[in-house]
Design a protein with these regions (language model features):
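Catalytic helix-loop patch of NAD(P)-dependent Rossmann-fold dehydrogenases
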Residues: 132-177, 198-206
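Alpha-helical substrate-binding/gating segment
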Residues: 190-198, 207-235
């Protein structure tokens, strides 16, 4: 039995660390793509293989990936692209990072003949745009995305690129609000609610959805093992 090999980009992030942990738990040979500056506080397991990928340098990225593939007996079985910007100083950064970096990774894997069994893109519910604030009907996966933020637009553009690559083995997760250990923003919100503050944005009823980070990490690995679906899922 050969252990499955997985590459997780954005491994130093909140969600990335939990995806790495779940992959290790299942016995995968687990590669964490990081930058030189990435905080590795939650990537302490000595079984992790680190690979420094510089998405701002196309040639260096290709060389690093090619070297890793050559040195380690072949391509990755699974790639989880969890790298993304949710906050950006300049709105152009959203497209450069969320669309541009993913496209570069896909194109490079193709060029190296290293397309995995499954490429899972961590996208976002924000590709859908504004919800129905009259009847509060939930989004259906068949609804057309109408993103209304630069962030949502950049994620939608990344999704569309995957769909256009002939036969590319992708699955897309449109993640909702993710909470859990090491996450700051929702934690502060929950603390204030717990201490008796109720707050909402605006004056309308709000329907928000959340997923616990460890459940999300489990779902990510399950989705890889289920094979490429060439479609998106809300999670």
């Amino acid at each position: 039995y050969m252990a499955k090999r997985i590459l997780v980009t954005g491994a130093g992030g909140f969600i990335g660390g939990f995806i790495v942990a779940e992959a290790l738990k299942r016995g995968y040979e687990t590669w964490a793509a990081v930058r030189r500056t990435t905080n590795r506080e939650f990537l302490q397991d000595e079984r992790i293989h680190f690979i420094e990928l510089d998405f701002t340098d196309e040639l260096a990225l290709k060389a690093t990936l090619a070297q890793a593939i050559a040195d380690n007996g072949g391509k990755w079985d699974y790639v989880v692209h969890n790298l993304g910007a949710t906050k950006a100083a300049n709105y152009l950064d959203f497209e450069r990072i969320n669309y541009g970096y993913m496209r570069l990774l896909v194109d490079t894997l193709k060029a190296l003949d290293a397309v995995p069994e499954v490429f899972l893109l961590m996208s976002s519910l924000s590709v859908m745009g504004v919800g129905d604030d009259e009847g509060y009907t939930p989004f259906k996966i068949t609804d057309d995305p109408v993103p209304n933020t630069r962030y949502g637009m950049s994620k939608a553009k990344a999704e569309n690129y995957l769909k256009m690559v002939p036969g590319f083995p992708y699955t897309i997760f449109r993640c909702t609000g993710v909470y859990g250990p090491h996450e700051r923003d929702y934690f502060l919100m929950m603390k204030s609610i717990a201490s008796g503050f109720d707050f909402s944005v605006g004056f309308r009823k709000q329907m928000l959805t959340f997923i616990y980070v460890k459940d999300l990490a489990t779902a990510v690995i399950n989705a890889l093992e289920a094979g490429p679906k060439r479609r998106a899922y809300f999670i």
